[in-house]
Every structure is written in C-alpha cells, then in structure tokens.
Amino acid sequence: METNGIKLTPRDIVSKLNEYIVGQDDAKRKVAIALRNRYRRSLLTEEEKQEVAPKNILMIGPTGVGKTEIARRMARLVGAPFIKVEATKFTEVGYVGRDVESMVRDLVDVAVRLVKDQKKALVQDEAQDKANEKLVKLLVPSMKKKANNNTNSNNPLESLFGGSIPNFGQNNDDEEETPTDEVKTKRSEIKQQLLNGQLEDEKVRLKVEQDPAAMGMLGTNQNQQMQDMMNQLMPKKKVEREVPVKTARKILTDEFADELIDQETANQEAIELAEQMGIIFIDEIDKVATNNQNSGQDVSRQGVQRDILPILEGSMVQTKYGTVNTEHMLFIGAGAFHVSKPSDLIPELQGRFPIRVELESLSVEDFVRILTEPKLSLIKQYEALLQTEQVTVKFTDEAIKRLAEIAFQVNQDTDNIGARRLHTILEKMLEDLSFEAPSMPNAVVDITPQYVDDKLKSISTNKDLSAFIL
C-alpha cells in the first residue's frame, strides 16, 4: 500500500498538524520525529531494521487539550492504520471482558479496510461498469434458467463422505436464458437512460449479503473470534431488498470491486501495513496505574499492565487474517495523571514509553485561536451549517474573545474538559438561532459580545447551572 505521507519531514508534519491543532508544539515535534524515524527505518538493511524498534510515546495532560487529535491526524497524514482504545476497558487474562490482544485485532481490521479501499479505488471504473450492466438486467429482466434440481437436492454432508460438493456460492437466480432481440433493444435504451442519470430514483429488487453482525453473538472476545470463524466457513446469506437505482449501484459496485481484487493478497498487505505502520493510542492509561491506596483494585490494574507489556515488547497475535507481529507498531499512551503519576506504572511498562511529553492546559488565547485558526474551525463550521438555510452569521472578534473567556471560566469553575467546552458553549449560544433558521431566509445575524452575554451570561455566572448545562 502506498504511504507517501511518511516521506514528510518533521517540519512538514508539524506544519500540517498546525492546520488543525492549536498549540502543543512540543507534542507535535515528538510525534513528528517518531513518524520520521519510521521512514528512516524503512531505508535500512533488513538486519538493521530488526534491531530498530519504534520509541513509544507517553502523553500527559488533561482531557480536551489535543492528545488524541494529534495522534489521529498524524496517522491520517501517512495513511497509517490507527485505533484508539481505553486501558480501562481491558481486563486481566482469565476474567470476563476484553483481553489486550483485541486491540491488535482491531488494528488489523482497520488496516484491511484501508488496503481494500485503496485496491477498490483502482478497479472502481470496471466495477461500476459491471454494476450498470447488472442494473440494466434488473430493470429489463429476461427469462430465468430453470434451476438444476439435482444440485439443489444435494445433502451438504455428502461432501464429507466422498459425494459431490454443493456449490453454495453460486446464485442460480442470476442465470438467464439468451435475451430476445426485443429485450436487447429495450436494454440498450435503458442503459442510455441509466448512464444519463435519468433512472436514479427508480426502484429495483436486489439480493444483498446480510451483515453477519446482525446475526452474531454478543459477549466475550472468545465468542467474537468464534463468530468470525463461523462467518468465514458458512455461505453468506443474502436477503432481497427494494432500493433506488443510485443505492443499488453503490451496493453492486462494492460487490464487484470485492470480486475484482485479490482478497488474500490484500489481507497479507494489510498485515504488513499494520506491523510496520500501525499506531495504537492507549487512552486513560493513568487509570490502570497503581498508587497503593486500594490494594484490591491494584492487583487487577497491575494485571492489565502486565498483559499490555508483551504487546508493547513485541509478540505474535493470532487474527482472522493471520499472525501479526507487534514488535514494530507504534504505541502512544495518554492520560491526565491527576491522581496517579507516570511513576505509578509498573517499571517495565514505564520503560516501554521512553518519550514523555506534557501537554499544556488551554488558556483564553488558545481558545480564541481554536475558534478561528484551524482549517475548519468551530466558527467556520457553524457559519457553513447555517448558510445552508440562507442565514449568514458573522462573529465579531470581540464576541469570539468573550466566548473564549466564558469557556475558560466554566472550565475553571467546574470540570476542565479543555477545548470540548467550546462545543457546548457554541451549541447553547446558537440553540435559538439554529431552531428558527429555516423560517428566516436571507437573514444576517451579527454575533457581538452583547449577543453572547444575553445567551450565556446568566448560565456561565451560576456555577450550579453551568455544571449541568455547559
């Protein structure tokens, strides 16, 4: 799989991250260096590659300051598979709950989707042509061939005793007799209309594969593995649905693209991508740190830490696509560490996060920058949303400053949730406008400090109300 983004220099990576994330320059520099080191490693000899392991990162800082966003944007820059997991969701081996290896399986699932999406894009035109041909046949059906009764009457168990193997995969309903000249003429007309986009809302009956998740078992990770194995062994069940042509085209294009790509090759490439480029973000790692205040919980927390340790050190994990080596994956741990400290992690785990970065709490000035500087800042998002109703919203600089001050103050007075506070502040302030917007086309609304205070001051100055509403 192509990952040209990995050739970006650390300066380029920081510049790209600055388009979406305000401040936290130290954290950006460290993840940029970690990313560049992956590119440097790819240029080494095979012998040298085996000796160079990624330097895992531990991010320390309160919620809402950009820990997850920095990691997610970094992964997106280079097309690397990325997942975020919470350390508190895992339990020690032998207890009910998710085991730590599930994070690796989830990462491989993401890698498989990335690789297959890229391969599907290469055969998109061919798949769409096949989908259009199929749609023409659905819109102008011909006579179906009679089913072969001998094949349908086969006992599935015969294959175990030397009998013929029933062909579950083939759908005899798709086979048709040679179309008549009249049908050919009609199909030619319909095909032209289809390509011109004249039949997008016409309904067709289509057989689609039923999502295995809809029939799956709920419960432990072992049950999920069993379900995955059963889904691979059993023939895929199809259900008939009536859908518009535009929806049917998407479904059929995806099915034909799946048939056109080599699934086995895609799976192997995905495993390699996960091994060499995978990024696992372990949030709330501070919650499994032990501070010797509650010995009962400490035992369980230490168990989770010890289970995570072999994954970080490098181990072989079985997935439904094959065996995956975690040795060269990049792990980013993150936590607020309000109650515990990084030194409360077991020493072996501390050693697996050699790069430490402390993210700063956000100031009023940071909030102002977050509202205005990013490529698609919150202000720009709300302006664009209301513009769809022909309502023009204009924020003055003073109003933006006032919003930032209120967000900062509410964070100080209640729980500090960082930049996420801006979402609740803006949503509350624009609630009435969003509700009335459809009935006020071509309106121009100026958001001034007075407007902000009218909507928010009574709430922001009342600590009890702000704790519940903002």
UniProtKB/Swiss-Prot annotation:
Q: Where does ATP bind?
A: 22, 64-69, 283, 348, 420
Which keywords appear in this protein's UniProt record, sorted alphabetically? Answer: ATP-binding, Chaperone, Cytoplasm, Nucleotide-binding
Its domain of life reads Bacteria
Give the CDD domains listed for this entry: RecA-like_HslU
Highest lineage ranks of the organism?
Answer: Bacteria, Bacillati, Bacillota, Bacilli, Bacillales
What InterPro entries has UniProt attached to this entry?
Answer: AAA+_ATPase (IPR003593), ATP-dep_Clp_protease_ClpX (IPR050052), ATPase_AAA_core (IPR003959), Clp_ATPase_C (IPR019489), HslU (IPR004491), P-loop_NTPase (IPR027417)
State the encoding gene: hslU
The name this protein goes by in its record: ATP-dependent protease ATPase subunit HslU
Region feature (Disordered): 145-187
- State the family it belongs to: Belongs to the ClpX chaperone family. HslU subfamily.
Species per Swiss-Prot/TrEMBL record:
Staphylococcus saprophyticus subsp. saprophyticus (strain ATCC 15305 / DSM 20229 / NCIMB 8711 / NCTC 7292 / S-41)
Which HAMAP family did the record assign? HslU
